[in-house]
Design a protein with these regions (language model features):
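Signature of N-terminal electron-transfer/Fe-S-associated modules in redox systems
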Residues: 1-202
């Protein structure tokens, strides 16, 4: 059967409206939902899960406002279908910090005034998170290149790059402090009441 106005068949319309049950993890929480196979990931997050921190901007994968992390990879939520997240782990801006405190990136953005209207900020933060997970000590030029896929009409980008540099520096210092603490614990004498030969040699 063919639609006389648009020339589309009923079977094609049925395919567009087809639904599929998916299971995925969003910010550490197991989720199971039935979704339209044509629904984009950003729409699923916003409309089905109420995670409205992922913003919908250009809808063409250009502006970066809808950026989320899927299995450790930065993706555009407006170009990714929800069904493509089947069995995967999705991280949104809402999952950037699970402690109730500002994440190291959020704190740096706040200190450097790296936001104004805030529309691009969630995508910026998640892109910066992906950068920090991928590269340990990126140069300022590398940071600029990595962030070039995220558009901001307000800040001029200078403060954003400054904030990311600050977050990277603090993260590195925190990692060094944690490593030192672990080393001290491993060298601490046993409190079990017996002393091994290896401890005596220390």
């Amino acid at each position: 059967m063919t639609d006389s106005v648009f020339g589309t068949s009923a079977s094609a319309t049925d395919a567009v409206e087809q639904r599929m049950r998916i299971q995925l993890e969003v910010n550490g929480e197991r989720i199971e939902r039935e979704v339209l196979v044509r629904q984009h990931l950003v729409d699923f997050l916003r409309e089905e899960l109420g995670l409205t921190g992922s913003h919908l901007g250009c809808e063409h994968g250009v502006c970066g406002a809808c950026s989320v992390i899927v299995d450790g990879e930065l993706v555009r939520g407006c170009l990714t279908l929800a069904v493509q997240a089947q069995g995967k782990a999705v991280e949104t801006i809402e999952g950037l910090s699970d402690s109730g405190q500002l994440d190291i990136l959020q704190q740096a953005f706040l200190e450097h005034n790296a936001m104004q209207c805030g529309f691009c900020t969630p995508g910026m933060l998640l892109t910066a998170r992906a950068l920090m997970q991928e590269l340990l000590e990126p140069s300022r030029e590398v940071i600029r290149e990595y962030m070039s896929g995220n558009y901001c009409r307000c800040t001029g980008y200078q403060a954003i790059v400054d904030a990311i540099e600050t977050a990277i520096r603090r993260s590195k210092a925190l990692g060094a402090a944690n490593s030192l603490g672990s080393a001290k614990e491993s060298l601490a004498p046993s409190t079990s009441g017996t002393v091994s030969a290896s401890e005596v040699s220390l």
